[in-house]
């Protein structure tokens, strides 16, 4: 399945999130909330992870939480944006096992069956080809490894479809089918509803641009203000 984000090249996405790196942490409420929820889902797991990838790590908040949860593991912060990785690097303490790797999620520079956990918070809307990304995840996962991910669904931000990238958000059934095609077994998917109230429409747009969900304020909105 090719997502609408395929209209943006990897370079386009890299540049967008390079720009957003400076403002991401002030505009990342959704990203932060889904990250926390995804970590909660991992609490019942009782495996010793030696190698973990935070795939699409953004500014590295999730990476640091993973390194605290799995203290013996080598955690890699993987993102297409060099500026996001620089921000992630500044978070880590001295002598940290965390390493930063700049890479496209559809072309991972890791050996087959070398990773215990792939953690991907809000990555899937930004991959050009869902199947290729899931195939790569399955390739690098060890037997009995875990792929934990969160993504927005097609009904997300439905009030703002005229200017948001909601067409990027994969349907849960498409993701489930993709996981099976990639060779992953026993996929478990569920849906959470997150309701957010912004102080103003301007603040909403500022957050969308600030976290990279939008490249810039929509031109038609600017035109209406003038």
Predicted ranges, named:
Residues 142-203, 211-222:
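Conserved catalytic/acceptor-binding region of the Class I
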């Amino acid at each position: 399945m090719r997502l609408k984000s395929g209209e943006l090249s990897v370079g386009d996405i890299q540049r967008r999130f390079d720009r957003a790196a400076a403002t991401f942490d002030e505009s990342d409420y959704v990203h932060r909330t889904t990250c926390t929820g995804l970590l909660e889902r991992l609490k019942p797991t009782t495996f010793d992870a030696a190698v973990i990838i935070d795939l699409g790590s953004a500014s590295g908040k999730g990476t640091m939480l993973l390194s605290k949860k799995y203290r013996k593991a080598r955690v890699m912060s993987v993102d297409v944006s060099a500026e996001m990785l620089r921000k992630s690097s500044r978070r880590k303490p001295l002598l940290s096992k965390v390493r930063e790797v700049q890479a496209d999620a559809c072309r991972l520079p890791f050996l087959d069956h070398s990773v215990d956990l792939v953690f991907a918070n809000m990555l899937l809307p930004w991959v050009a080809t869902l199947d290729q990304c899931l195939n790569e995840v399955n390739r690098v996962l060890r037997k009995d490894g875990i792929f934990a991910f969160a993504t927005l669904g097609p009904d997300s931000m439905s009030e703002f479809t005229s200017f948001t990238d909601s067409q990027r958000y994969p349907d849960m059934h498409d993701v489930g089918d993709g996981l099976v095609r990639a060779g992953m077994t026993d996929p478990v998917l569920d849906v959470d509803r997150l309701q957010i109230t912004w102080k103003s429409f301007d603040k909403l747009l500022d957050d969308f641009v600030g976290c990279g969900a939008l490249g810039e304020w929509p031109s038609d909105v600017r035109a209406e203000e003038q």
